[in-house]
Amino acid sequence: MNKKELVKYFYEVIVSENMLDELPKYISENCVQRTGVKTYLIGVDGMKQHLLALKKTYPDYTMKIIRQYIADDYVISEFIMRGTHKGDFIGITPTNKVLEITGVDIDKVIDGKIVEHGGATNTFETFFEHHLIKPV
């Protein structure tokens, strides 16, 4: 698999099908989370905790990659995440509605593993559309 295929498979199969035992095949023990200019060591365990937290909020969520770009070792993936809102999320009470949230992930892949992960999700549009947040 090339880098784009690896990242797409990771999100659409490993993450979407909750195959957390497979994480060590795709995530480096030295994987960092990039937030702006800061990085935080998360490794396999940190990625697992992140995915478990998402599954508490959206137990059936899946990810669909709709576009990808590559620059050196970085794979930029535009995605749609779809799942039923069944758990509390940043103080928002579960709605049991199926929500679709768009986003972009930026993953650095070295030697067949993700060594750096970052990105952003556009929760505003979805939450506004479903009246989970209101204008001020």
Positions of predicted regions on the chain:
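C-terminal and inter-domain tail/linker signature
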Residues: 1-136
